């Protein structure tokens, strides 16, 4: 898919801007604090309805204003689709084809974007929460069912945890309601677990090939889904539900004593194995970076496989974080395949040579100038 046009109105430091993009590589270049990341963020928000930098939508609205608008046209194999998001103190409204969507979950999936920022290089060495967030964010874009199930799971988890605390401090005594909450939680949790198993298996296939290539055939990569149920590719949702519900029943007293839910996909993780060794514990920084890069690039192919369309790729200041070999791999892997937006304060010679006919936009104080490419 291609984002042909973007319009920003009172979004962050952009007053009123309409920009037409290159279907290939778009370079957003400028000094610090001019609005490069804000532009990538706008595309990301147009894709997922929320920002990767803040959970407070109000921050997206220009400080002098009361509302903001992001709109754009996405071109897919089925045709052109106009998308629009409005933010105000009353909340946000999402429109597809000029029609307001009753639920944001109906909107997500129209425009898919993969964001790669320097912090993604710590996907491997960062906390398990980072990897769970990664799974939820990426798999939600590929499957509205996943988005729904993960959302329901989160809501029920909050309810169950609140109830467990009330039982712990004896503000409640009725365990029947706890059983009902655990039953529902196990049902949505099982859906999330089986979907993660499925998506990670496919992601592994793509990532292993890329990793081998980037490491010049020296390393093999495997991805293991770490979960308390130890599911395999053959485990059904029903089996996972039964197993998870049993864990809740068997550990009811422990969960009450701890005032929190101990089992479920909110405790999952991903283990990355390079040449069969856990790269988080034993890998060099370079191996960890190669792993993160392979996994990010693999997402592009996974998304194409699952949705039939390539996503957009948003690269926020990552080139400067990668050495020449990894830069070369990244840039050759995306050329002529995915529409790419990359921010940088200066483009290295390597990148200039590798990028095919980019459009270069110079950003200064929330305005854009197109640079003629020499
Ligand atoms: N809600 C807002 N209203 C107005 N201006 C904002 C708002 N939010 C952020 N800004 C301004 O946007 C600018 C930051 O833009 P951005 O994060 O895109 O920088 P950048 O060009 O990516 O820089 P760097 O290279 O340092 O990452 C800052 O000047 C900040 O003050």
Swiss-Prot record:
Q: Which family does it belong to?
A: Belongs to the RecF family.
User: One GO molecular function term?
Assistant: ATP binding
Instruction: Write the record's keywords in alphabetical order, separated by commas.
Output: ATP-binding, Cytoplasm, DNA damage, DNA repair, DNA replication, DNA-binding, Nucleotide-binding, SOS response
Any one Gene Ontology BP term: SOS response
Name its cellular compartments: Cytoplasm
Please give the InterPro entries that the UniProt record associates with this protein. Answer: DNA-binding_RecF (IPR001238), DNA-binding_RecF_CS (IPR018078), P-loop_NTPase (IPR027417), RecF/RecN/SMC_N (IPR003395), RecF_2 (IPR042174)
Its job: The RecF protein is involved in DNA metabolism; it is required for DNA replication and normal SOS inducibility. RecF binds preferentially to single-stranded, linear DNA. It also seems to bind ATP.
Q: What is its main location?
A: cytoplasm
Which Cys pairs does UniProt list as disulfide-bonded?
none
Q: What GO cellular component term, any one, is given?
A: cytoplasm
Q: What gene is it encoded by?
A: recF
Origin organism of this chain?
Answer: Limosilactobacillus reuteri (strain DSM 20016)
Tell me where on the tree of life, at the top rank, the source sits.
Bacteria
Listed name of the protein: DNA replication and repair protein RecF
Q: Please name the Pfam families in this protein's record.
A: SMC_N (PF02463)
UniProt xrefs under CDD domains: ABC_RecF
Per UniProt, ATP binds at 30-37
HAMAP family per the record?
A: RecF
